[in-house]
């Protein structure tokens, strides 16, 4: 139906209509969390007010609006010196009108060649472009508060294009519509134009007694999203779920010089509340159910240093590096970085091929400016991985740990470590990937309750024995011989994995049946 508002209306809720006209000097308020879907145009001389998280949804790129909206957006709690990344959902929005009390030189845009630059605050915000604006000058520098911005103007609709820089350059772009958009459709529409990941800068308030905070980039690609703060920390941050709210901007990395496109096929009903607060300095179908099996891992210490990664098995991903399915870590955290590895790529999100196999394994690496105790833990999992046993192999300590049973704690020096950890799903695969050509170095036999080891070429340095659950049953580091016997080994009848480290640094692993 065509709807005409000739009186004030203060409590409009979700509705789908053909067109909307508001009479001069009249105001219609769409309540928070509701969506007004309009098939054709919005017009009239009145004003449509969209409360925070409300949405104006249109799906036809050819529709031209002439009516005015006032769209309100609330930030996460901020300090005076915090910057929020904005984009405009209306035409001809001036930067100063987003935050009138911000200092004149604290309105920034991102130049792909030179980084952040001061933007005259009387400039209009370009459609699809992202801007960083500091908090109002009257805001506290110690106590955070929510800031509410208002965007006034004709609501944007239809195709919006914005130019990216040369390959591997950063760009800051943003949702140009008064409704949320689907990040997966955005990435598919702009396939090969970007590296296939979106990055949202997050700033965290350190919790009392925490020595380190976790300022970093939350990331999202077609596999999923990762957060930048532990759930128990007291910082209520959002894991990117593929819904980008109106007014929100974000980083992309160019894969080729050219333009990226926003259009109405990306717009979605509702889901207009995932607004991130950053800080200092063809036609594609709607996202249908896709087979995914995902594992989120946390790397952290007891003082607040934290990094999360995601490993996911899904359609169209491969075990090689793939745009849209693998997202590189931007190493925005000044204390720690944690990643999975494909060749020389350090990945915060890694997509892997289906079907999932328990014989698969994933190498992990980390960097730390902090020495001391850390832990690696499963944050959560879904699909087949929600019930899958997950082992963490520590190659430095020769330990295989079942992460379903408990977090794995270890100590580290400061530095970068690319060859310490491996994720596995089956203890029987331990050693098969790296030491498959080393079996001839080792001969293992069982006589009675005695396990006898003989090395054909190298001196044995260390022996570890694991059961099939990954539990270490035996370890010694004082062999220094080519022969070694474990007398009267205490074990039930079961399959055991024998792992040997030689003086040369090589390793070998063999399975035995102990009875």
Regions found by a protein language model. Give the residues of each.
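Extracellular beta-sheet-rich ligand-binding/adhesion modules
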Residues: 1-63, 117-121, 128, 135-143, ...
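Acidic, glycine-rich segments characteristic of secretory precursors and extracytoplasmic regions
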Residues: 23-113, 151, 159, 164
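Short acidic/polar capping segments at secondary-structure boundaries
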Residues: 55, 90-92, 136-138, 177-178
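Short acidic-glycine loop/turn motifs at beta-strand connectors
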Residues: 65, 111-113, 135-137, 254-257
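Detector for glycine-centered tight turns/loop "hinges" at secondary-structure junctions
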Residues: 113-116, 120, 397-398, 505
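Compositionally biased Ser/Thr/Gly- and acidic/asparagine-rich
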Residues: 125, 137-490, 502-515
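A short tyrosine-centered beta-strand micro-motif
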Residues: 131, 250, 494-500
């Amino acid at each position: 139906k065509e709807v005409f508002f000739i009186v004030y209306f203060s409590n409009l809720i979700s509705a789908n209509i053909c067109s909307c006209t508001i009479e001069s000097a009249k105001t219609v308020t769409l309540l928070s969390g509701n969506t007004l879907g309009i098939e054709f145009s919005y017009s009239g001389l009145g004003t449509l007010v969209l409360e925070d998280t409300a949405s104006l949804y249109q799906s036809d790129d050819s529709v031209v609006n002439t009516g005015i909206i006032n769209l309100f957006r609330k930030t996460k709690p901020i300090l005076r010196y915090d910057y929020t990344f904005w984009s405009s959902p209306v035409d001809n929005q001036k930067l100063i009108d987003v935050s009138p009390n911000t200092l004149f030189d604290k309105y920034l845009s991102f130049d792909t060649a030179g980084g952040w630059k001061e933007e005259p605050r009387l400039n209009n915000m370009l459609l699809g472009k992202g801007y960083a604006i500091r908090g109002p000058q009257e805001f506290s520098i110690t106590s955070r508060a929510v800031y509410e911005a208002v965007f006034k103007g004709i609501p944007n609709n239809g195709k919006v294009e914005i130019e990216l820089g040369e390959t591997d350059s950063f760009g800051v772009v943003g949702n140009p519509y008064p409704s949320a958009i689907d990040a997966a459709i955005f990435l598919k529409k702009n396939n090969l134009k970007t590296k296939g990941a979106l990055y949202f800068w997050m700033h965290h308030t350190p919790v009392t007694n925490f020595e380190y905070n976790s300022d970093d980039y939350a990331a999202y690609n077609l596999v999923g999203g990762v957060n930048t703060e532990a759930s128990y920390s007291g910082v209520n941050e959002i894991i990117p779920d593929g819904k980008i709210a109106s007014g929100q901007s974000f980083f992309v990395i160019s894969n080729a010089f050219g333009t990226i496109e926003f259009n109405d096929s990306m717009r979605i009903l509702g889901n207009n509340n995932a607004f991130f607060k950053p800080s200092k300095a063809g036609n594609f179908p709607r996202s249908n159910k896709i087979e995914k099996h995902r594992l989120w891992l946390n790397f952290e210490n007891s003082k607040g240093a934290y990094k999360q990664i995601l490993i996911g098995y899904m359609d169209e991903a491969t075990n090689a590096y793939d745009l849209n399915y693998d997202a590189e870590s931007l190493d925005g955290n000044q204390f720690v970085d944690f990643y999975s590895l494909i060749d020389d790529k350090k990945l915060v999100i890694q997509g892997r091929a289906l079907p999932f196999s328990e014989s698969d394994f994933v190498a992990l690496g980390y960097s730390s400016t902090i020495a001391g105790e850390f832990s690696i833990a499963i944050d959560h999992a879904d699909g087949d991985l929600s019930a899958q046993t997950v082992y963490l192999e520590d190659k430095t300590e020769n330990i295989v740990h079942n992460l379903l049973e408990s977090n794995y704690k270890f100590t580290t020096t400061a530095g970068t470590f690319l060859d310490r950890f491996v994720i596995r799903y089956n203890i029987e695969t331990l050693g098969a990937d790296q030491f498959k050509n080393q079996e001839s170095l080792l001969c293992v036999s069982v006589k009675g309750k005695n396990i006898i080891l003989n090395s054909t070429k190298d001196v044995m340095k260390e022996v570890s024995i694991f059961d099939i659950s990954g539990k270490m049953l035996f370890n010694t580091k004082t062999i220094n011989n080519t022969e070694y016997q474990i007398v009267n080994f205490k074990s039930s009848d079961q399959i055991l994995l024998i792992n040997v480290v030689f003086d040369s640094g090589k390793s070998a692993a063999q399975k035995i049946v102990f009875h």
